[in-house]
């Protein structure tokens, strides 16, 4: 963990954006989890350290997934959207991240 803490510059690049969707808000209300879009090469340990550093909360566990990009048509040719890596971050009981307050 100390090895990960030393590289704060890397931790600032791990979290790309919070995922605000219907499913993400249902998960947040029910299981005390928050969903983030993360860098494609980010590890679970880096995601945990980044959330703890940026939001000053305690993280219980992290689950990651890679959502494959869809085939889409761009004009005449077929293309493909990029893959997205998401992290479901489970917070310890009593911990909360409020994005409206963090933005101000």
From Swiss-Prot:
Domain of life according to the entry: Bacteria
Gene Ontology, cellular component aspect: ribonucleoprotein complex; ribosome
Record keywords: Ribonucleoprotein, Ribosomal protein, RNA-binding, rRNA-binding
GO BP field: translation
InterPro entries: Nucleotide-bd_a/b_plait_sf (IPR012677), Ribosomal_uL23-like (IPR013025), Ribosomal_uL23/eL15/eS24_sf (IPR012678)
GO terms, molecular function: rRNA binding; structural constituent of ribosome
Pfam family, one: Ribosomal_L23
Family: Belongs to the universal ribosomal protein uL23 family.
HAMAP family according to UniProt: Ribosomal_uL23_B
Protein role: One of the early assembly proteins it binds 23S rRNA. One of the proteins that surrounds the polypeptide exit tunnel on the outside of the ribosome. Forms the main docking site for trigger factor binding to the ribosome.
Subunit structure: Part of the 50S ribosomal subunit. Contacts protein L29, and trigger factor when it is bound to the ribosome.
Protein name: Large ribosomal subunit protein uL23
Native source organism of the sequence: Burkholderia multivorans (strain ATCC 17616 / 249)
